[in-house]
């Protein structure tokens, strides 16, 4: 391998390439998503590159410009960009298209400029490999810095240990993407010290991927590992390596993986977490193991069938996905990405945009295969570096098929360098074989000037979006915690026009409406609630909010209309279900209440919240002792015997709230008597409590305890037996213990011992073991 020589005239190119690769190292700077400042940075580097080529590097343009514009790739990409821009005219929310278009353009121009920067460099592949290696070392340093901070306190908390990236999947994918370049350098460099260092980096990368538990990254890393081993066997046979050399090459690859596996098993065992072997065992292309991806893909493909040409519009799948998946969206967390970049593009730009996007990767694959074939044809053997170029492509492809790297600047900056390298290698080779005349300098300058004019407003959009994401944080925090403390001045500081949706697709106007209503600006609140619905017409948050306002104002029929619309739009959304039920209660629509419950139950299953809302609605609309209502309440209580709300509603439907209130009032008197040592009076009052509220076994337990303290042991036993029928384990445990003590005090030793034996077996506590020994072996009982 030749050494890397850097000419002084090429220094700006190397510097710009370094600036591209560090895109993913930026923090969030107060924004709710780390991508916002990274898009700004990537846009700024594109502008810097454009200025460099426009004013300082005409030679690069003269040699690299025309080959690119003779390729299919550039025209396919230009069509893709233009079609994305045209989606503004049919997008559900055109503002989202304007916000996302500069992101698509950023990746395009990053590839465009990386190609220009790489095209004339000597040893292109070697330099880019080293560049990826250096950034990987930085990524691993950040990851393990988090690791040593988090692990002693929280163990293998993969959510908290994330390095540069915003989440674990991005961290793992980014590391996995760069590992093939480490393998390439490991088998290209010959100095022992270099190779040792690369083995350490490879070990650190593989261990990080295994600990993060991101299955897509683990799968792609395993594929890379197996393909590389097969390639080593191929070289051993074709190149006739000695057994010693072949084993060294294979050993240098296997050793870091084996050591990483050992460390993974050790750390996972220490932290009581699943090891990588468990994660690999869960890799399967089934609905159960896909974390909902099959559902996302099915919804997305169904949408494309319905909208083959004019789909949702760039950036609008997070809106369109709501109506597609409305039966399994239980809150306001929407599937804003299809978890497959290729399918996702189809959902936003239709068949034309989707095919163009796939075509870009087909082109790059074709260029790689041509490079491999030409080298094989010339040398009779597969070229090492071109084979290695296939491996990160596989990693990116698997990640794009299961996640959404297209939305992450960390992955897009790496893709830009990688695609620029492939284009540089392929077009440089073809250009040498078939010389192409350079275009006129004026045309080159004009194109770059046009690009600059596009990049500057794109950067402005990124900055506006970033500032909005900074300010959305408090708004989303209060929304998620049902707190509404922001002042009018703070609300006015958050733009609701551009962007008009939060990062989670919530309409900002509607979110502000709740504050306005609470602050007394009711007319404005009503208006803003519905204005927000225009920005995201699929989430029905504004309609549900409008129903709340109207119900509070006593306008039941109007509230019902909006609540019904919100419920039918998202029937599995619990706030919508709750509000619709409240309006049905207000209208006394008893039959519809049952129908709505069964509809939601079929979607959500027997969850506690749907039963609670339903039983509450029955309690407000059915008469006392209604057999149907009591039967439903009993079913809910059987499902959730420990839930106090359901238990209270069950009792309310059975014998009425008045008796429950009277029992609570008597309970206060009983507790006062008990505290004053008037145990028999307390016991009689607790008896009355239990007579009025016989399902509340706390009263029977307290009656038993009062009789016990009053030395009325037979009566105490009677009430402890009643308490033992409770579904509350704490109540049953105390009742069983004091029954044993009462039996012992009543002189019924054998019966007491039987109870103590049951107590220590059913509730294995040291105290009960000691009491069993004390009362059943230390003394002689009657």
Language model regions located:
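TM-adjacent membrane-interface loops and short helices in multi-pass inner/ER membrane proteins
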Residues: 292-335, 342-345, 349-356
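Alpha-helical transmembrane segments of multi-pass inner-membrane proteins
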Residues: 4, 10-27, 45-53, 81-88, ...
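A membrane-periplasm/extracellular boundary helix in multi-pass inner-membrane enzymes
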Residues: 146, 211-212, 217, 232-289, ...
């Amino acid at each position: 391998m030749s050494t890397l020589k850097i000419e002084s005239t090429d220094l700006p190119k190397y510097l710009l390439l370094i600036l591209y690769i560090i895109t993913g190292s930026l923090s969030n700077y107060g924004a709710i998503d780390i991508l916002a400042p990274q898009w700004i940075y990537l846009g700024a580097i594109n502008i810097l590159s454009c200025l460099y080529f426009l004013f300082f590097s005409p030679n690069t343009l003269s040699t690299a410009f025309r080959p690119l514009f003779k390729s299919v790739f550039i025209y396919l990409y230009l069509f893709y960009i233009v079609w994305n821009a045209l989606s503004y005219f049919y997008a559900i929310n055109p503002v989202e298209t304007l916000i996302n278009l500069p992101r698509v353009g950023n990746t395009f121009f990053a590839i465009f400029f990386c190609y220009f920067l790489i095209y004339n460099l000597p040893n292109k592949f070697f330099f880019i490999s080293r560049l990826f290696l250096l950034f990987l070392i930085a990524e691993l340093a950040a990851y393990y810095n988090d690791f040593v901070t988090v692990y002693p306190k929280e163990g293998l908390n993969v959510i908290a240990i994330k390095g540069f990236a915003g989440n674990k999947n991005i961290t793992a994918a980014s590391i996995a993407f760069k590992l093939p370049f480490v393998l390439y350098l490991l088998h290209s460099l010959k100095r022992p010290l270099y190779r040792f260092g690369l083995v350490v980096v490879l070990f650190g990368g593989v261990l990080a991927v295994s600990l993060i538990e991101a299955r897509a990254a683990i799968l792609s890393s395993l594929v890379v590992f197996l393909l590389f081993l097969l390639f080593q066997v191929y070289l051993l046979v074709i190149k006739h390596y000695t057994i010693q050399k072949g084993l060294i090459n294979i050993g240098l690859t296997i050793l870091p993986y084996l050591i990483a596996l050992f460390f993974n098993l050790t750390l996972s065992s220490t932290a009581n977490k699943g090891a990588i072997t468990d994660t690999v065992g869960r890799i399967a292309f089934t609905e159960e193991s896909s974390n909902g991806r099959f559902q996302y893909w099915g919804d997305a493909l169904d949408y494309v069938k319905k909208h083959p040409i004019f789909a949702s519009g760039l950036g609008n799948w997070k809106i369109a996905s709501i109506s597609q998946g409305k039966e399994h969206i239980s809150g306001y967390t929407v599937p804003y990405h299809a978890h497959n970049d290729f399918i996702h593009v189809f959902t936003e730009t239709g068949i034309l945009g989707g095919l163009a996007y796939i075509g870009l990767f087909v082109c790059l694959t074709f260029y790689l295969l041509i490079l491999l074939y030409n080298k094989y044809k010339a040398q009779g053997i597969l070229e090492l570096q071109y084979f290695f170029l296939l491996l990160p492509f596989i990693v990116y492809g698997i990640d794009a098929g299961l996640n959404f790297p297209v939305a992450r600047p960390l992955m897009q900056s790496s893709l830009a360098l990688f695609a620029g390298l492939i284009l540089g290698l392929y077009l440089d080779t073809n250009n040498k074989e078939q010389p192409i005349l350079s275009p006129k300098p004026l045309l080159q300058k004009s194109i770059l000037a046009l690009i600059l004019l596009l990049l500057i407003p794109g950067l402005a959009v990124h900055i506006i979006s970033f500032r909005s994401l900074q300010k959305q944080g408090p708004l989303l925090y209060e929304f998620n915690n049902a707190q509404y403390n922001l002042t009018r001045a703070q609300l006015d500081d958050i733009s609701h026009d551009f962007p008009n949706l939060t990062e989670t697709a919530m309409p900002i106007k509607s979110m502000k409406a709740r504050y306005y209503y609470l602050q007394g600006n009711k007319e404005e609140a009503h208006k803003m609630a519905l204005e927000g619905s225009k920005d995201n017409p699929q989430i029905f948050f504004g309609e549900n909010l409008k129903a709340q306002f109207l119900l509070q104002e006593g306008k039941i029929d109007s509230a019902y209309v909006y609540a019904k619309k919100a419920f039918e739009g998202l029937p599995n959304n619990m706030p919508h279900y709750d509000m619709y039920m409240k309006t049905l209660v207000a209208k006394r629509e008893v039959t519809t209440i049952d129908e709505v419950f069964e509809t939601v139950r079929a979607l959500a299953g027997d969850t506690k919240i749907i039963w609670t809302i339903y039983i509450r609605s029955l309690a407000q609309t059915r008469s006392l002792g209604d057999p149907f209502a009591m039967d439903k309440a009993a079913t809910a209580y059987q499902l959730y015997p420990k839930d106090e709300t359901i238990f209270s509603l069950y009792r309310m439907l059975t014998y009425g709230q008045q008796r429950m209130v009277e029992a609570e009032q008597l309970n206060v008197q009983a507790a006062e008597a008990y505290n004053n040592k008037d145990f028999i009076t307390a016991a009689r009052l607790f008896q009355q409590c239990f007579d009025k509220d016989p399902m509340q076994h706390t009263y029977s337990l307290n009656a038993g305890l009062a009789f016990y303290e009053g030395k009325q042991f037979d009566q105490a036993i009677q009430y402890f037996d009643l308490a033992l029928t409770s579904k509350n384990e704490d109540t049953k445990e105390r009742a069983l213990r004091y029954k044993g003590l009462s039996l012992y005090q009543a002189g019924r030793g054998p019966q007491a011992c039987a109870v103590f034996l049951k107590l220590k077996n059913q509730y294995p506590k040291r105290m009960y073991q000691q009491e069993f020994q004390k009362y059943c072996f230390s003394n002689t009982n009657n």
